[in-house]
Regions:
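Hydrophobic transmembrane alpha-helical segments in integral membrane proteins
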Residues: 1-14
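N-terminal membrane topogenic signal
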Residues: 1-4, 26-30
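Soluble extracytoplasmic regions of secretory-pathway and membrane proteins
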Residues: 15, 20-21, 39-914, 918-934
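Cytoplasmic-side transmembrane-helix entry/capping segments in multi-pass membrane proteins
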Residues: 28-35, 301
Length: 935
């Protein structure tokens, strides 16, 4: 409402003169000032948006990136608008001059001027629409003008791949725009002459022969001929470009130009080009001939010629050849083109150097575990992200207004040991504040940031089946110096959506501290400083209106932080990049950072099979790092060989940094992206078949293995991280993996055995390298879905599950993981949790371990594993929490919890007494959490 009053108050400044003239019945002046007022308001809105956005970019150090795109969009807007109205004005003035009578005719003159004014008025929306559409294609223009070569040529036209990635999309946009303008031009000409016919009664009673002899008809066909010259030129360009688009043909079994495309479709396009060139000359001739009938004859002949070529040459003949010549001889004719499809698809998805290793699975768990196996086993993830989040929500929430957006998986070197951790940030969610606390000051000046982190090892838990935390509570307590957090405040996060003002006269809420709250003042440099009236006006226009001028809490040192959620913040700066679905945060040198994988993609890589909707080229070329306190955004180029990112770096030299400039503490946390491996695996499941004959018959086609998620529902496994030791390595490393099963056309009866596993390496110099474990084809290797079925059908496990469900608890299954070990052994692990129907806090109750045909089941991972390897029992204590507190410490902690619970209960009673039932319900939820901690 205050924003509305602010808008009205500014509007009055501009509209008061108009109101004064309106009162004096000076309507023309009143209208003039009203238009000036509207233009001024629009100008102020545009100015405030551009000015405030430029200040935001300047604070991040990317002002040059903002201005470059803004000016490029303005240039495209003007270019598109000018071209559009140039064509329109040419047609209008040609008509107006030819329609003027030879002698004086005031009535005809006035009507012609009326038509002229209407036509001219239409040019304004045409200019705006054409300019807006053109400016929206700034990314294609940017790449076109900053193109770099790929150093590879397509096999048909021998053009560098860069032409298809950088030039072809922009050329397509230009040709499509001109085609639309040609259509509009014809409609405009038709409208002008129809209006003339209606106003001046040109046509009534005229037979066709008589009509063709009139000056009106001659002017009409002459102007249409001139437009056809323009349109035919555009169609020549369109047909010429269509030749290159054969490299994305879907005809037949090949994606890309196949036998029919190159032996029938391409020659037909060449014939069409010759025919269009002939028609262009005919239309040029028709523009100057004095015979209307001859011109109409040219139209009909050209239409028949082009229609015949289009229908017969471009549609019917290629389909006949495909059906009768190619389909009966498909494999021998299409094999060379299948080879191209395989080769270029692998190149486009970065799959040319996958190291394939035979892994003759040993179904027996017998033998001694190597030291590397023990390291792998001690790092296997038992906590599922969604289940750990549910536990965190119960044990580490602290207050209702905190929120854990998700759980991230990463590795840390703790005491010299590579350890896989699961981490959750405690962000602030103002929507969870009590209704009476949702005030302007609370939402924008006091509750400004989240606080701290929660971290737990992936496989350690207490005797109660809860996680053993390495970082917990507020302020955060870290069990290892490598996990210390010197700056735990989170001003920029995954779910930090609102704007805030910092460095105000009010102290910010920091974290709850006993009966009071700790307070804080922001000391960073993020945001826009509110040190002038002009800045305050621009901020008020976008955000808080009059409140910004009436509040007494702002000082010249105050700052506004906006666009604080990482997703929008990063995408605003680099909208031309594609981003992974999952960003993750890391702790490095005592600070919290977000890391986000960004991709360069394209849809026009020749002969490459599309996926991800339309894209058929992808590179993980950029690692984005965002400081959770300062809000800084850094773009590190992780694949400098990618021509697409080199083009963007050429356009924005100050935006991208070399990967070597990334601090080592952050490099240690770079991961291979989950989305990228999922996409590559989807492609490699088919394109690992390099032989055209095998590929054609799909003899060895795979798909990503599936796992049961409900009673009769299965879905593909998502990539998961492991600590593993690969054959060519002398140490354990962090890898991302995904299993494959044979492809099945019948989804109701899939082939569920496992045929391979792909590993993506995440560490050091081996980052990004892919390794494939190929399993034997001559014997059964159980897949995840089969293992899941066996677990559910095991008699002992089934009885326990039934008993737990009957006791009112809900059984939840964790992620089913396949883990390769030494001696070509393949181990499956699945944890089982139970949670009460009230409280929703899962606890680990059983772990299932499977080797081949043998299944083991225990109350802990070690217990289940020790049935295969008795020596593992000695290390069971490693994954059980050791008592970390003395009895006195536990007693003191329990005393604090009792006091806190009593206070929460008293708060609940007070709220109930006041009739504030919603707030009382929230107070009761908080009491429940405290009581859960006391268990």
């Amino acid at each position: 409402m205050l924003n509305f009053f602010f808008f009205v108050s500014i509007s009055l400044i501009f509209f008061l003169p108009a109101l004064r003239y309106l009162k004096q019945q000076h309507y023309k002046r009143a209208g003039t000032f009203a238009l000036l007022g509207l233009a001024s308001l629009a100008g102020i809105h545009i100015w405030s948006d551009v000015y405030l956005t430029s200040l935001w970019y300047d604070n991040l150090g990317y002002a040059s990136r903002y201005w470059k795109v803004l000016f490029l969009r303005a240039e495209l807007f003007l270019a598109g608008g000018v071209v559009a109205i140039s064509l329109g004005l040419t047609n209008i003035f040609f008509w107006y001059r030819s329609a003027k009578p030879a002698g004086p005719s005031p009535i005809r003159d006035n009507r012609s001027k009326l038509i002229l004014l209407v036509g001219l008025a239409l040019q304004i929306p045409l200019f705006i629409a054409s300019g807006t559409i053109s400016s929206a294609h700034w990314n294609e223009a940017l790449l076109f003008f900053n193109a770099v070569p790929f150093g590879k040529e397509d096999p048909v036209f021998l053009k560098d791949i860069g032409f298809y990635i950088f030039s072809l999309p922009f050329l397509n946009f230009i040709v499509d725009s001109l085609s639309s303008l040609f259509t509009f031009s014809l409609l405009l000409v038709a409208g002008l002459y129809v209006a003339e016919s209606v106003f001046f009664r040109v046509l009534p009673g005229l037979a066709f022969d008589n009509f063709t002899r009139t000056p009106f008809a001659h002017r009409l066909v002459t102007q249409i001929s001139a437009n056809f010259v323009f349109g035919t030129s555009v169609f020549i360009a369109r047909t010429f470009i269509a030749r290159y688009e054969l490299l994305y043909s879907h005809r037949g079994v090949v994606y890309g130009a196949g036998w029919t495309d190159l032996h029938a479709q391409l020659p037909a396009y060449n014939v069409a080009l010759v025919a269009l060139a002939g028609c262009l000359l005919l239309f040029l001739y028709a523009s100057f001939t004095s015979s209307t009938r001859r011109t109409i004859g040219i139209y009909l002949a050209s239409a028949a010629l082009l229609g015949g070529i289009w229908i017969v040459g471009l549609q019917i003949i290629p389909e006949i050849i495909q059906h009768f010549r190619v389909s009966p001889n498909e494999l021998p004719l299409e094999s060379p083109y299948l080879e191209r499809n395989i080769k270029f698809t692998k190149e486009a998805y970065g799959l040319t150097n996958v190291a394939e290793i035979e892994f003759p699975v040993n179904p027996s768990p017998s033998g001694v575990l190597a030291q590397s196996d023990l390291t792998i086993i001690n790092g296997i993830r038992l906590w599922a992200p969604d289940i750990l989040k549910a536990v965190n929500d119960q044990t580490q929430f602290i207050r209702l207004y905190y929120n854990f957006p998700d759980v991230d998986v990463d590795r840390y070197m703790l005491n010299g040991k590579l350890t896989q951790l699961m981490l959750s940030l405690r962000e602030l969610n103002i929507s969870r504040l009590a209704a009476q606390s949702r005030t302007f000051q609370n939402e924008t000046m006091i509750y400004t940031h989240g606080y701290g982190d929660v971290a737990a090892p992936v496989n350690k838990f207490t005797h109660e089946g809860l996680p053993e935390y390495y970082i917990k509570d507020i302020p955060p307590i870290a069990s290892y110096p490598e996990l210390r957090i010197d700056q735990p405040r989170i001003y920029f996060g995954e779910e930090t959506f609102n704007h805030v003002y910092v460095n105000t006269k009010l102290k910010e809420f920091d974290y709850p501290k006993g009966d009071t709250n700790a307070q804080n003042t922001y000391s960073g440099k993020a945001g826009v400083q509110i040190d002038s009236f002009v800045k305050k006006l621009a901020i008020a226009m976008r955000f808080d209106g009059l409140r910004l001028f009436t509040t007494q809490e702002l000082t010249p040192e105050s700052r506004i932080l906006f666009t604080r959620d990482i997703n929008q913040r990063v995408r605003t700066i680099a909208p031309f990049l594609t981003f992974d679905k999952d960003m993750y945060h890391v702790i490095a040198e005592g600070k919290i950072y977000f890391m986000w994988d960004a991709y360069t993609t394209a849809t026009t890589y020749p002969y490459s099979q599309p996926t991800m909707g339309k894209a058929n080229y992808i590179r993980n070329s950029v690692k984005v790092v965002v400081d959770a306190y300062e809000g800084t955004v850094d773009f590190y180029v992780s694949d400098k060989a990618d021509p697409v990112i080199r083009a963007y770096a050429g356009a924005f030299p100050s935006l991208f940094k070399p990967f070597d400039a990334m601090p080592k503490s952050l490099k240690n946390h770079v991961r291979y992206p989950e989305d990228l491996l999922a996409i590559q695996s989807h492609i490699y499941a088919i394109y690992h078949m390099g032989d055209p004959g095998v590929f054609y018959n799909r003899e060895d086609a795979w798909e990503i293995s599936r796992v049961a998620i409900r009673q009769e529902e299965a879905q593909p496994i998502l990539p998961y991280y492991l600590i593993s030791k690969l054959p060519d390595s002398d140490r354990e490393e962090f890898v991302l993996t995904l299993p494959f099963s044979p492809y099945s056309t019948d989804k109701n009866s899939p082939r569920n055995n496992m045929v391979a596993m792909i590993m993506a390496r995440c560490d050091g110099d081996k980052y990004g390298k892919l390794m494939l474990f190929k399993f034997p084809k001559d014997r059964q290797v159980y897949g995840p879905l089969q293992i899941g079925i066996r677990i559910n059908q095991d008699e002992t496990i089934s009885k326990d599950l039934t008993l737990w469900n009957q006791q009112g608890s809900q059984v939840r299954f964790g992620n089913l993981l396949a883990v390769p070990l030494s001696g070509y052994r393949l181990m499956y692990i699945q944890p089982i949790y139970i949670q009460a129907s009230v409280g929703k806090m899962p606890e680990l109750r059983r772990v299932v371990v499977v080797f081949g045909d043998q299944l083991s089941y225990g109350a802990s991972f070690e217990e289940a594993l020790s049935k295969f390897f008795p020596q593992i029992g000695g290390s069971a204590s490693e994954n059980r929490a050791k008592p970390a507190e003395t009895k006195e410490e536990k007693k003191a902690e329990r005393k604090d919890l009792v006091a806190t619970a009593a206070k929460a209960f008293e708060n609940y009673r007070n709220l109930m007494g006041k009739g504030k039932y919603e707030e009382a319900g929230k107070a009761l939820e908080e009491l429940g959490r405290i009581l859960n901690q006391m268990k």
